Design a protein with these regions (language model features):
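ABC ATPase NBD coupling module
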Residues: 54, 64-78, 214
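The feature captures the beta-strand-to-loop junction immediately N-terminal to the Walker
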Residues: 35-37
């Protein structure tokens, strides 16, 4: 078992503190859910962990290796952002080997969810199809830890259920942190759940705590 250890994360924008003394651990074999209202800093936290944004303070390590730059994160952390990142003119089948080892490349080529997209360039895909392709490339990548920012956004119930199944399958040998406003889908598959609220990250033990912290209405 490997551990991604995130500690002492602080981040401010324009004098306003977004994240304060954040601590979170992700282990291979587990899915960690990250919940919070819009604008609380969930995406910023994932960007700091991925190395695309620098915190005012941060301490991030994978097992005994402190992660300082992008090279340190190579093959350790893969990040699915909310924005599209794949090159528009390249066919999906040609992108898969760039992200995945031989074994996972073969698995992806046989996966029903992506089969219809293999011979298409990204520019020809719908918004939903692009999200499917990008999510699968990240999930099946060589990285040990996966960060997913709004992976279910825009998906049909059928596609969401299939993506949940794949996330759970990949978590058997990877550590996954997932953030999505569709909290039911996150809670359904998460082994541990954290709530980001008022700049702090709180470990959530049961559904009632989400109500106590005013993330969910008391009537639910």
């Amino acid at each position: 078992m490997s551990r991604l250890h995130v500690d002492s994360v602080i981040k401010s924008f324009g004098g306003k503190q977004i994240l304060k003394d954040i601590y979170i651990v992700c282990e291979t074999g587990k899915i960690t859910g990250l919940l919070g209202r819009n604008g609380t800093g969930k995406s910023t936290l994932l960007k700091i962990i991925s190395g695309t944004v620098k915190g005012d303070s941060q301490y991030i390590r994978s097992d005994h290796k402190v992660l300082i730059n992008q090279m340190d994160r190579k093959r350790r952390i893969a990040y699915l952002p909310q924005h599209f990142f794949l090159p528009k003119g390249v066919k999906i089948k040609n992108l898969i080997p760039l992200f995945c080892n031989q074994e996972n490349t073969e698995k992806l080529f046989e996966l029903e969810l992506i089969k219809p997209l293999l011979n298409e360039a990204c520019r020809n895909l719908s918004v939903g199809e692009k999200k499917i392709a990008e999510a699968l490339l990240i999930l099946y990548s060589d990285s040990e830890f996966i960060l997913l920012d709004e992976p279910f956004n825009g998906f049909s119930p059928k596609t969401t259920a299939e993506m949940q199944r794949i996330i759970k399958e990949q978590s058997k040998h990877k550590g996954i942190i997932i953030s999505d406003h569709r909290y039911h889908e996150v809670l359904d598959i998460s082994d541990e759940v954290y709530l980001l609220s008022d700049t702090y990250l709180k470990r959530i033990k049961d559904f009632k705590e989400l109500q106590q912290h005013n993330y969910l209405p008391k009537s639910i």
